[in-house]
Design a protein with these regions (language model features):
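Short, acidic loop-to-helix structural element flanking the phosphoryl-transfer center
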Residues: 62-88, 94, 98
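Asp-based, Mg2+/Mn2+-dependent phosphohydrolase catalytic module
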Residues: 78, 94-175
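Short beta->alpha linker loops
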Residues: 3, 27-31, 55, 68-72, ...
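Active-site neighborhood of HAD-like aspartate-dependent phosphohydrolases
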Residues: 1-23, 169, 173
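Helix N-cap/coil-helix junction residues
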Residues: 17-19, 45, 105-106, 138
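Alpha-helical elements of Rossmann-like donor-binding domains used by nucleotide-donor carbohydrate transfer enzymes
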Residues: 7-10, 34-38, 55, 75, ...
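Metal-dependent phosphoesterase signature
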Residues: 18, 38-75
């Protein structure tokens, strides 16, 4: 998520918006359109959320070369590949999700990708995860979902799935 935050900081600053790091992490998983709507409304600054989202996504794509795999998560993905259907359920856009998967050469591990552009109600609503389960033909109650943000954990629980907070995995790995 540090690359996302760098892209957000660069883009929001150009439009006079303030986006503190703690707020960024609190809104993790929320669609970029919704984040911008919230920030502009709270700060009384009018912006074109769609245009600014595309600017943020373009900045992210510039920075993507610095991205890498999360080893603890990729171990699970590699062990599960071919044994369990897997999907990505992201609050991001198609462009950024596909971009990072292609950059890390891991797109082939996933049977479906659902982004904020595929559903009506983004995280913390369960729609993103429910659509991912539907696309891989697995009942939600039989799904385990990995997430790195509080909003996403709430969405997983609302979908009736088992959540795994990858932040706990990362903290344990760094000890």
């Amino acid at each position: 998520m540090p690359i996302h935050y760098a892209a957000w900081c660069s883009t929001t600053a150009k439009h006079g918006l303030v986006f503190p790091e703690d707020r960024f992490y609190a809104l993790g998983g929320v669609s970029p359109f919704e984040v911008l709507r919230m920030l502009s409304e709270e700060q009384g600054i009018e912006i074109d959320s769609e245009a600014v989202t595309f600017q943020k996504e373009a900045k992210y794509m510039e920075l993507i070369g610095d991205a890498g795999e999360i080893p603890e998560v990729m171990q699970i993905v590699r062990e599960s590949h071919g044994r369990l259907p897997m999907a990505i359920a992201s609050g991001g856009t198609h462009e950024t999700v596909e971009g990072i998967l292609q950059h890390c050469v891991i797109r082939h591990y996933f049977d479906a990708i659902v982004t904020s552009q595929d559903i009506v109600n983004p995280k913390p609503a369960p729609d993103t995860f429910l659509e991912a389960a539907r696309r891989i033909n697995v009942a939600p109650e039989k799904c385990r979902a990995y997430e790195d943000a509080d909003m996403g954990i709430r969405a997983i629980l609302a979908a009736g799935m088992e959540p795994v907070d990858v932040r706990d995995m990362l903290a344990a790995a760094s000890r």
